[in-house]
Each structure stands twice: as C-alpha cells, then as structure tokens.
C-alpha cells in the first residue's frame, strides 16, 4: 500500500525523486515557495523551471505552497532544499510534521559556520529523534533518474526498520535502494565528494587529462575517508555506492553541477562568472571552507579541500592549485 509522502523543495533533484516516489505507488505532495512552480506541478504536472526535460509528471503528484497543508498527512517527509538554507527553511516546519513521520534528507553539504552535517542540521531544526531521520545518497544524477535510467542509492537510518520503510517507498523497476545504519558515513560521502568534483572539473576545464583526474579523485577519496573515520563513520561506506559510486558519477559527468562549475573555473571564469553561467552556486562551493574547518576540528589534513578553498577565496589558477598538492613531504599513501 502506498504512503503519503511530501517533498520539501521542487528543484531538479527533489522533483525527480518525487517522480520516483510516485512511480513506486505513493501519493506525492511537492512543497515549493515559488507559486509558479506550485501551479505548474499541480495544474499541468510539469516543472518547466527546474525539470523541463520531463514533459509530464505522474498524476499522483501534486503541489502546494502551504507548509501545514503540505505535511499534515505525511508518512514520510523528504527534504530537498539547498543545504546552506536548510536550517532557516526547516524551522518553519517545526511542530507541523506528524509525530510518526520519518524525515528523509536528500541534501549533500556541510553547514558553513557550524561545520555540521545535514543530519545534525535537520534534527536540530525539527527537534527530531535520530531514529526518525534518514538520508539518501548515491550516484544519483537528477536528469538521468528523471529519464528513468537504471540507478541505485543508499538509505541510511540508525533504525534499520525505518531505513527499510523508506527504501521500500522508493523502490521501482529502475531505482534500487540499499540500506545501512551508517548515517555519518553516508552524510560525509555525499558532502565531501562535491569538493573533489569541483577540483576534477577544474582540471578537466584547464585541459589536464586522465592521470590528473584520477589522482584528484583518488586523493579526494582518501581525504573524505579519513575525515569520515575521524567523525565516527564506517570506512566501508566510502567504498560503496554512497562513496566511490557517487564520486565516479559526480566527477565524470557534465550533468553534475559541481563538475561543471569546476570546469568553468578551469577555463578561466571567476567564481562570480561561473555562478552566473551555472544559474546558481554548486553545493561544493560553500562546503569547501566548511570541510577545511572540519579537518582542523578533527585534526585531519585536507590538502585538496585547502587548495580548492584557495581557488574559491583567493582566485588561484588550476596550475597553482595542483602545484599546492605536490608541495608536501614524501609520505605513505
């Protein structure tokens, strides 16, 4: 039997995941602030602003701009809001979400200023117990999922039964979820790989080849694994779909906003110019400084994140960024 599921945020990924949930037989309500998007989804089953490639969304998807109406009957509430705005947006839903509902985060990022993961931000904002929070992460490029190309993901919750409930609610013929209790690992994977994707994209945009890209990806994986382990994550998580899988997809596709943003930087655009071309800032941009700060907090070296921070804040070139990665003593891998 299908569930009542609300998706907060009708961007490309939120809408694409809403379609997955609808295809799985659930009744889906999208919540958006923009009245134009609400009316488009509700009246025309289309999201021309954020996901124009899908001509018709399923009939069991609707939309509203009213917060209370959006969540009043929800069994599951999915959060697909830009990570850096999550806390401000979610506070408005405190006290509105039913006590039995599981809250699921699709967000990937570290909150700037607090260095907190999205699970911490969501739980603090909604005063939510750990067993009612779940996160979803994996190699999930929204355009491909919107086109119903086969894909897999990972659902993490400290309560395995609740992780399974969420996984069952988003299982379709083309979308396969796996479950884990390693929320910290999943959150760290989803957040930190965006910094690596920026760096790989920048190298590609500057004209560097496979060796350079492979070096950045591999060292980026080592960096995020070390950070995750220091934060209490299971290192195995970083070598599954949420880690290596997401890294491969994000670092190798022009569909990835982080990769594309980095590529534009590599071609010589400034951060401001790349933001305009990308129609917004990629999540990896505000996350980069937070990763550096988190590394300092956990006493874990973050050379790649540090060099990307210099790119974003000081405007150094790709060649200078790469030179910075080589300016260390010889160590074991």
From Swiss-Prot:
Keywords: Cytoplasm, Lipid biosynthesis, Lipid metabolism, NAD, NADP, Nucleotide-binding, Oxidoreductase, Phospholipid biosynthesis, Phospholipid metabolism. One of its GO terms (molecular function) is NAD binding. This is Glycerol-3-phosphate dehydrogenase [NAD(P)+]. Belongs to the NAD-dependent glycerol-3-phosphate dehydrogenase family. It comes from the Bacteria. It is found in: Cytoplasm. NCBIfam families: PRK00094.1-2, PRK00094.1-4. The lineage of its organism: Bacteria, Bacillati, Actinomycetota, Actinomycetes, Bifidobacteriales. Its EC number is 1.1.1.94. It catalyses: sn-glycerol 3-phosphate + NAD(+) = dihydroxyacetone phosphate + NADH + H(+); sn-glycerol 3-phosphate + NADP(+) = dihydroxyacetone phosphate + NADPH + H(+). InterPro entries: 6-PGluconate_DH-like_C_sf, 6PGD_dom2, G3P_DH_NAD-dep, G3P_DH_NAD-dep_C, G3P_DH_NAD-dep_N, NAD(P)-bd_dom_sf. Pathway: Membrane lipid metabolism; glycerophospholipid metabolism. One of its GO terms (cellular component) is cytosol. HAMAP family: NAD_Glyc3P_dehydrog (MF_00394). It is an enzyme of class 1 (oxidoreductase). Catalyzes the reduction of the glycolytic intermediate dihydroxyacetone phosphate (DHAP) to sn-glycerol 3-phosphate (G3P), the key precursor for phospholipid synthesis. NADPH binds at residues 13, 33, 108, 142, 257, 281, 283. Gene3D superfamilies: N-(1-d-carboxylethyl)-l-norvaline Dehydrogenase, domain 2 (1.10.1040.10), NAD(P)-binding Rossmann-like Domain (3.40.50.720). GO terms for biological process: carbohydrate metabolic process; glycerol-3-phosphate biosynthetic process; glycerol-3-phosphate catabolic process; glycerophospholipid metabolic process; phospholipid biosynthetic process. Sn-glycerol 3-phosphate binds at residues 108, 138, 193, 246, 256-258. The active site is at 193 (proton acceptor).
């Amino acid at each position: 039997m299908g569930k009542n599921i609300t998706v907060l945020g009708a961007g490309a990924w939120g809408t694409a995941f809403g379609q997955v949930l609808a295809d799985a037989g659930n009744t889906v309500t999208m919540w958006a602030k923009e009245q134009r998007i609400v009316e488009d989804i509700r009246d025309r089953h289309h999201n021309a602003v954020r996901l124009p490639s899908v001509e018709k969304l399923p009939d069991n998807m609707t939309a509203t701009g009213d917060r209370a109406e959006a969540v009043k009957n929800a069994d599951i509430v999915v959060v697909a809001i830009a990570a850096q705005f999550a806390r401000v947006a979610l506070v408005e839903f405190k006290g509105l979400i039913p006590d039995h509902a599981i809250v699921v985060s699709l967000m990937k990022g570290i909150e700037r200023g607090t260095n907190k993961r999205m699970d911490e931000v969501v739980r603090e904002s909604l005063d939510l117990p750990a067993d009612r929070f779940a996160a979803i992460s994996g190699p999930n490029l929204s355009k491909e999922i919107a086109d119903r190309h086969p894909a897999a993901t990972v659902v993490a919750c400290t309560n395995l039964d609740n992780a399974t409930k969420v996984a069952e609610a988003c299982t379709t013929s083309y979308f396969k979820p796996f479950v884990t209790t390693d929320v910290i690992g999943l959150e760290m994977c989803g957040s930190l790989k965006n910094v690596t994707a920026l760096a790989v994209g920048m190298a590609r945009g500057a004209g560097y080849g496979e060796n350079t890209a492979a070096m950045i990806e591999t060292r980026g994986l080592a960096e995020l694994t070390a950070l995750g382990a220091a934060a209490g994550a299971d290192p195995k998580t970083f070598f599954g779909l949420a880690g290596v899988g997401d890294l491969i997809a994000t670092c190798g596709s022009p569909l990835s906003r982080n990769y594309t943003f980095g590529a534009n930087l590599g071609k010589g655009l400034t951060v401001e110019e790349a933001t305009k071309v990308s129609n917004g800032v990629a999540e990896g941009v505000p996350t980069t400084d937070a990763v550096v700060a988190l590394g300092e907090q956990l006493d874990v070296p973050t050379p790649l994140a540090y060099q990307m921070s210099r790119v974003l804040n000081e405007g150094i070139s790709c060649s200078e960024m790469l030179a910075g990665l080589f300016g260390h003593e010889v160590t074991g891998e």
